[in-house]
Each structure stands twice: as C-alpha cells, then as structure tokens.
From Swiss-Prot:
Catalyzes the reductive methylation of 2'-deoxyuridine-5'-monophosphate (dUMP) to 2'-deoxythymidine-5'-monophosphate (dTMP) while utilizing 5,10-methylenetetrahydrofolate (mTHF) as the methyl donor, and NADPH and FADH(2) as the reductant. Residues 2-207 form the ThyX domain. It comes from Pyrococcus horikoshii (strain ATCC 700860 / DSM 12428 / JCM 9974 / NBRC 100139 / OT-3). The keyword Nucleotide-binding does not apply. FAD binds at residues 56, 80-82, 88, 162-164, 168. The lineage of its organism: Archaea, Methanobacteriati, Methanobacteriota, Thermococci, Thermococcales. Binds 4 FAD per tetramer. Each FAD binding site is formed by three monomers. Pathway: Pyrimidine metabolism; dTTP biosynthesis. Its cofactor is FAD. This is Flavin-dependent thymidylate synthase. DUMP binds at residues 77-80, 88-92, 146, 173. NCBIfam families: thyX (TIGR02170). Keywords: FAD, Flavoprotein, Methyltransferase, NADP, Nucleotide biosynthesis, Transferase. Homotetramer.
Length: 243
C-alpha cells in the first residue's frame, strides 16, 4: 500500500499568504506586520481575497510530501505537474529486491481478482527480477540492468509543491477519471493537509479538491462516470468531517 506523509511546509502558511496578499491593499503593510497577523486576520481576509480569484498569493506557501510504494506508472504521471520539485529513488544506485514480487511491484486489484491471470503476472514479474539479477551478476551495471524492469516497480519520491499548484493538482487527480493509483496518492496528500488543524481551513477557502468542488459542476460532461459527482463530493465532505 502506498504511504504518503506531509513532511514539511511553510511555517504559518495561512498567515504568510494573508500577509503577502495585504501588501496590495493595506497602507500599513510592512515586513514587521507579519508578526501581527492573527488567525482572526486570516479568517477575515483570506476567504474574501480568494473569492475574487486572486490565487497567486497561494504560491507563497509550499508543502513537501514523501510518497513510498507507488509504481513508476504513478510517478510518471506525477512529474507532469511541472511547477513542482521532485527527487526520486534512483535505480542506478538502489538495487531492486529480487526476492519478493509483491514487495517489489505494484499489482492492480483488477489483476488480483483473476487468479489465473495473477499467476501469469507473478511469473513474468519474477522472470524480470531473475534477468535483472543475472545481468548484474554478469557484470552489467544497474543503470543498464534496470531496463528489464517493468513500470510497475515500486519507487519512492519526495514532492514539493506550492499551494496554488497543489490546488491544480488536486483538481485533476482527485477526479474519478484520474488513473486509480495517482488518484489515491492525491487523496492521501489532501488527507495529510486535513489532519493539521492550522491547515484544514484552507481546504474550504481555496477549494482544495477535485474540479467539481472547485467549479461547482463537473467539467467532464458526457465523460463523467455515472454517480461520480455525488460520490466525489461525499468523499471530500467526509474527509473534512473526519478531522
């Protein structure tokens, strides 16, 4: 199972964003004014400013996540979000565990439901590990031996995004039409934010959620899966109520 954890974020992120926003409107703005920004100031000003669509201020707050146990299929989609920073486990220097297929690869649930197909998958994955190991034993460097490994191999990655990019990421990847693995990573990232009392308000104020939450309607139109709008909104609401 993929593990996601919020490792670090801008100290006082909502105060930082509010303080930055007020430079445009407040004659009394100063560097020192940051220390005077209270939670009450945040609650008064930030929702109003965001309601005007002034979202560039969200870029002043950044969040760093660790993601472990997802496949390279997932991270290949993740790094398409270009306004972010990524550092991923290297297959050049980290040797793949050749002993355990299920510990080394992500196998979709759809495959696990078909016992005959699952057996074939495991045999092929095991064979790829054997060839990987054999290549290294024959003197092939890991950077070349890794070419035999499929995209399902598990990986680890550190991701840093600013709050505005996170909103864009959530809009696309929390949607039911997103691929299942990156969708679950996105929901776990959102949950990591919701767990923290000082961060939770920004989820509603900035509408951190799928696009149906952000826009108030589903932009996928005829591509929308049946019942998706209701399910997604309920999942988002339940997440907020949980914490």
């Amino acid at each position: 199972m993929v593990k996601v954890k919020l490792i670090n974020y801008t100290p006082k992120p909502l105060e930082t964003v509010t303080w930055a926003a007020l430079i445009s409107y407040w004659d009394g703005w100063s560097t020192e004014a940051f220390e005077k920004i209270s939670p009450n100031d945040v609650e008064i000003h930030l929702p109003r400013i965001l309601s005007y669509g002034h979202e560039s201020i969200l870029e002043h707050a950044t969040f760093t996540f660790s993601i472990e146990g997802c496949s390279r299929v997932c991270t290949h989609q993740l790094v398409r979000h270009r306004i972010a920073s990524y550092t991923q486990q290297s297959q050049r220097y980290i040797k793949i565990n050749p002993e355990d297929v299920e510990e080394t690869f992500v196998i979709p649930e759809s495959i696990k439901k078909d016992s005959e197909l699952l057996k074939e998958w495991k045999e092929l994955l095991k064979r790829s590990l054997e060839l990987y190991e054999k290549s290294i034993e024959r003197g092939i460097h890991q950077e070349d031996a890794r070419f035999i490994l499929p995209q399902s191999v598990k990986t680890k990655i550190v991701v840093t995004m600013n709050l505005r990019e996170l909103k864009h990421f959530f809009g696309l990847r929390l949607c039911e039409r997103a691929q299942w693995e990156i969708r679950e990573v996105a929901w776990k990232m959102l949950e990591e934010i919701a767990k923290r009392k000082e961060l939770k308000p920004i989820i509603e104020w900035a509408k951190l959620g799928p696009r149906c939450i952000q826009l108030g309607y589903c932009p996928e139109r005829e591509l929308m899966p049946p019942g998706c709008l209701k399910r997604t909104r309920e999942r988002w609401k339940n997440l907020l109520e949980k914490y």
